[in-house]
């Protein structure tokens, strides 16, 4: 019975391992007769060794690679434990013709001698870079990296491979940049991989399976579908798998554990949880038409950006639980399926379950500037949120032929449980004005569904470049839950306490459609027009309860109905395939009607009031040589959020209540951008220059005031003056050692200037009695008529203040990569300058500076050492904030066949802080937020499947010997 059971297990394992392969029991298995195949690979012209060439065998009458290796630095290769039999030996290297030989191996040692590879002239003619053995090939708008030319550890992941490639960068939030430009989409074999979550591929795809990395600069999705240039481009990083992994399966599993160990001081903004863990597993099966990927993660430390937790709210808003300043525990189970079995269609379906436990904390100090005496306030807050989410995504598209179709549905369900605690105190002239405490517990569920659909018909009725396109979007969300709010405010004259429970219910629906038509005039001109209509409806109720039961006074209800319409007409002239110009105009209209009831009073606003915004449309692109110049100008309108228009007072933070404004209007936005890209592919250098200007018409800002008890009130208002801003960004990346490309210098300069308007008081104003608050009476005194005549004239005590903010920054970086070593030295200098019209004596200057270094080294014995060190210092911050700090992290890893052992120490000196600085027209605030602090983490990772074919074969042979 035991032998039968073992035999069954072995047969199942063999089936999982093989794809188009038949497993035959023969004397080579039962007696252990194996061959060792050796060879040396050299260049046929120079007789120099060729390292990193693929050296593998395929059993006769089969298509699956059974044994695989790469040549070493001397061009030598060795395949161990090849069962006796008939095989095809293949040796391949980028830029060379493949070597192919069929042979029956039945010797203990089969020495293939010296194998000379011939240069493939046809392949090299397509590339700008033509050096023999060069790991980089550039053709048209694609940069291709040969993965075998970049040395990484045996069990390295995709992110480790990318870090060794010239121009590649992995950001702190798990995104990829190439030569300073963000990668918009990451695909595997040309297919979507877990939608927009790049970190899943970076942290889970083994580098061993990668054949090539391609960075593709292509036109936007809309341009590809319609043929009409929209001025946008996207950068795609495509991971091409080695042939032996295009069919079959592979995977990896990892586990890490450790603990926090902060210094002796008791710091509430340092993680004190103790035990830390992180585990993940990935399994993938690939065939010519299908890709199936399964992942699982569980962790309470996101040391690899492996999980991004997103929650969809009632309006479809996406919220990350792992925001900056939060410590998260998370679990994820997901599946992603790509298939091209439907003729002419590519399909992607994904499903995810995610759990999150997020903790955050902060400590802030704010100075509010007033003529009759500054107000100082300090606050501390802590929160914890639990969330469970289930989501499913789909993408079905056809990008070839005259008819293009795209359907993208999405569904999600989430349940949240949040706890928030805060306290604050306010002083003036050295005297305590008030203290406050509050705690909030919110429990809720939300359901969200949406679908984006498009249909484009090109060359309509047989006329080239005539296009007719339709898009249709629909979404719906439901949310419900309950909130318990408790608060206590102690003032000089009185104390106020509240204990209320709210039952919340929200419904939101959105429907929009667009039609596009393009008519060619001759071969170079296309006249196009679009019309878009959208309708949205938002209903929400908030029933309040106190110790006596239902409280109508604090209950509220609102119904919002919105309509928007947009019309666009342009003329596009095509100079060449890469140079064109588009001129036109757009007309946008918004209608927002709101019925609301709060404090026992009903209000209707915005009825029949359309807001119209006209903007020019300018899009120009001109390409010549290595240069591309683009100009872009357009505009849009945007309605205020529903919560900002509710006629209610939010007292969840009793020391800082907020009030909605039913008279808010939509704001318009007109922008202009210009960019110049110089991409010298021969030198591998990139120069980018971008200018951006923006004009906000009637932007939403805030009016804030303190009362004599130090309570800070806020209400959103439209500014009468436009907000004008501009920015410039330039980046230059170049190798310093010619074609060797080991040394890379990057210098980035960023600068911005903005002129904005806000409304503030010169001193205190009367407070609001929350027990007798009447919204209509308050707005009549504060706002006046519907146009805001009292507020804008200054009769309610507010003055118009203009603020000019200037933000210059400099980011130099020097990187060195050679074989097993990668190093980087970088610095950053950011300055914020604020100038105020009401009181120039309050003008401010702050500076954030940082210098740092990073190094990674891998030894021939598969040890890998990684460390980074930085020093940060600050100027212009409040007392007690902005202390300089050292940040030092280190990691050691050791690969042993299919396993990797690692130990990582984060924040070795225990000095890391999370500091933010906020400057507005009338206050300055410094905030420290919760950070992980110092911790140690031990890890074990195992790669399984095809990538360890020889080891898997050994295990199977041993099992068969035990069974028989």
Predicted regions and their residues:
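Membrane-proximal, glycine/serine-rich, low-complexity loop/turn segments characteristic
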Residues: 20-34, 74-76, 90, 97-99, ...
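Short, ordered, surface-exposed loop/turn motifs in non-cytosolic proteins
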Residues: 37, 45-60, 136-138
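Short Pro-Gly-centered beta-turn/loop motif in secreted/extracellular proteins
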Residues: 51, 78-86, 94
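A short, solvent-exposed loop/turn motif at the edges and junctions
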Residues: 59-64, 86-102
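Short, acidic Ser/Thr/Gly-rich low-complexity loop/linker segments typical of extracellular
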Residues: 60-76
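Outer-membrane beta-barrel translocator domains and adjoining extracellular loop/strand segments
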Residues: 226-227, 264-268, 296, 305-313, ...
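Outer membrane beta-barrel strand-and-loop segments of large Gram-negative receptors
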Residues: 378-380, 512, 554-556, 566, ...
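Signature of Gram-negative outer-membrane beta-barrel scaffolds
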Residues: 526-623, 836-837, 842
């Amino acid at each position: 019975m035991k032998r039968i059971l073992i035999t069954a297990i072995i047969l199942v394992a063999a089936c999982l391992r093989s794809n188009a392969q038949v497993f035959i029991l023969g004397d080579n298995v039962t007696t252990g007769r194996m061959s060792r195949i050796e060879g040396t690979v050299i260049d046929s012209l120079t007789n120099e060794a060729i390292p990193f060439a693929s050296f593998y065998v395929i059993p006769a009458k089969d298509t699956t690679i059974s044994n695989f290796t790469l040549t070493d630095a001397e061009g030598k290769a060795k395949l161990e434990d090849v069962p006796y039999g008939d095989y095809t030996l293949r040796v391949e290297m980028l830029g060379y013709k493949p070597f192919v030989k069929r042979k029956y191996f039945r010797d203990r040692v089969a020495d293939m001698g010296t194998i000379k590879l011939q240069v493939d002239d046809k392949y090299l003619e397509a590339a700008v870079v033509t050096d023999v053995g060069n790991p980089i090939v550039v053709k048209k708008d694609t940069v291709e990296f040969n993965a075998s030319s970049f040395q990484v550890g045996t069990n390295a992941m995709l992110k480790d491979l990318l870090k060794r490639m010239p121009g590649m960068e992995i950001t702190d939030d798990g995104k990829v940049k190439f030569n300073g430009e963000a990668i918009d989409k990451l695909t595997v074999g040309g297919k979507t991989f877990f939608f927009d979550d790049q970190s899943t591929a970076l942290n889970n795809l083994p580098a061993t399976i990668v054949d090539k990395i391609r960075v593709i600069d292509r036109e936007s999705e809309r341009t590809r579908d319609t043929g009409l240039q929209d001025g946008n481009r996207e950068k795609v990083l495509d991971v091409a798998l080695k042939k032996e992994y295009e069919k079959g399966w592979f995977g990896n599993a990892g586990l890490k554990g450790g603990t926090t160990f902060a210094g002796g001081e008791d710091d509430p903004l340092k993680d004190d949880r103790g035990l830390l863990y992180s585990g993940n597993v990935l399994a993938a099966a690939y065939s010519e038409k299908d890709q199936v990927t399964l992942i699982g993660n569980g962790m309470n430390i996101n040391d690899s950006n492996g999980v991004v937790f997103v929650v969809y709210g009632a309006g479809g808003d996406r919220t990350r639980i792992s925001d900056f300043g939060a410590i998260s525990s998370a679990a994820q189970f997901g599946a992603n399926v790509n298939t091209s079995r439907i003729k002419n269609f590519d399909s992607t379906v994904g499903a995810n379950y995610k759990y999150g436990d997020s903790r955050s904390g902060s400590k802030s100090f704010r100075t509010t500037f007033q003529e009759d005496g500054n107000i100082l306030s300090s606050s501390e807050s802590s929160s914890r949120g639990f969330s469970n989410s289930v989501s499913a995504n789909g993408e079905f598209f056809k990008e070839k032929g005259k008819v293009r179709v795209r359907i993208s549905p999405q569904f999600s369900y989430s349940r949240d449980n949040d706890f928030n605690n805060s306290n604050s105190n306010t002083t003036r002239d050295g005297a305590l004005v008030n203290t406050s405490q509050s705690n909030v517990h919110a429990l809720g569920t939300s359901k969200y569904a949406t679908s984006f659909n498009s249909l484009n018909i090109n060359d309509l009725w047989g006329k080239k470049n005539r296009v007719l396109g339709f898009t249709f979007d629909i979404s719906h969300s439901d949310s419900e839950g309950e909130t318990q709010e408790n608060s206590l405010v102690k003032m000089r004259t009185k104390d106020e306490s509240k204990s209320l429970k709210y039952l919340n219910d929200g419904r939101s629906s959105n429907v929009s459609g667009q039609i596009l038509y393009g008519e060619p005039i001759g071969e170079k001109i296309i006249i196009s027009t679009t019309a878009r209509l959208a309708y949205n409806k938002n209903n929400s109720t908030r029933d309040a309860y106190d110790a006596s039961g239902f409280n109508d006074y604090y209950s509220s209800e609102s119904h919002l109905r919105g309509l928007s319409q947009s019309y666009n007409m342009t003329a596009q002239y095509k100079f060449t395939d890469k140079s064109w110009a588009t001129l036109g105009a757009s007309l946008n209209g918004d209608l927002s009607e709101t019925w609301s009831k709060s404090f026992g009073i009903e209000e209707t606003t915005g009825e029949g009031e359309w807001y119209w915004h006209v903007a020019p449309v300018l899009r120009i692109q001109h390409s010549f040589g290595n240069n591309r110049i683009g100009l872009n100008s357009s505009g849009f309108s945007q309605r205020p959020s529903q919560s900002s228009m509710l006629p209610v007072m939010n007292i969840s933070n009793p020391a800082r209540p907020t009030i909605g404004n039913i008279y808010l209007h939509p704001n318009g936005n007109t922008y202009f951008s210009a960019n110049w890209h110089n991409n010298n592919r021969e030198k591998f250098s990139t120069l980018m220059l971008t200018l951006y200007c923006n004009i906000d018409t009637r932007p939403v800002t805030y009016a804030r005031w303190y009362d004599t008890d130090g309570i800070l009130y806020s209400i959103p208002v439209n500014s009468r003056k436009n907000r004008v801003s501009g920015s410039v960004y330039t980046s230059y990346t170049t190798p310093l050692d010619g074609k060797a490309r080991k040394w890379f210098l990057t210098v980035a300069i960023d600068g911005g200037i903005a002129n904005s308007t806000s409304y503030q008081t010169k001193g205190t104003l009367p407070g609001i009695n929350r027990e007798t608050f009447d919204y209509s009476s308050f707005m009549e005194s504060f706002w006046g008529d519907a146009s805001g005549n009292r507020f804008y004239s200054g009769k309610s005590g507010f003055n118009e203040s203009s603020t000019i903010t200037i933000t210059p920054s400099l980011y130099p970086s020097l990187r060195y990569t050679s074989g097993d070593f990668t190093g980087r030295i970088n610095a950053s200098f950011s300055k914020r300058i604020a100038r105020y019209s009401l009181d120039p004596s309050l003008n401010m200057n702050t500076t954030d500076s940082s210098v740092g270094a990073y190094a990674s080294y891998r030894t021939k014995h598969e040890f890998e050492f990684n460390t980074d060190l930085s020093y940060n210092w600050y100027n212009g911050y409040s007392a007690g904030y902005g202390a300089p700090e050292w940040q030092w992290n280190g990691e050691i890893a050791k690969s042993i066949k299919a396993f990797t052992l690692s130990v990582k120490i984060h924040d070795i000196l225990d000095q890391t802080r999370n500091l933010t600085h906020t400057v507005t027209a009338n206050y300055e605030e410094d905030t420290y937020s919760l950070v992980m602090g110092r911790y140690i983490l031990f890890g074990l990772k195992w790669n399984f499947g095809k990538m360890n074919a020889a080891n898997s074969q050994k295990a199977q042979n041993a099992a068969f010997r035990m069974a028989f």
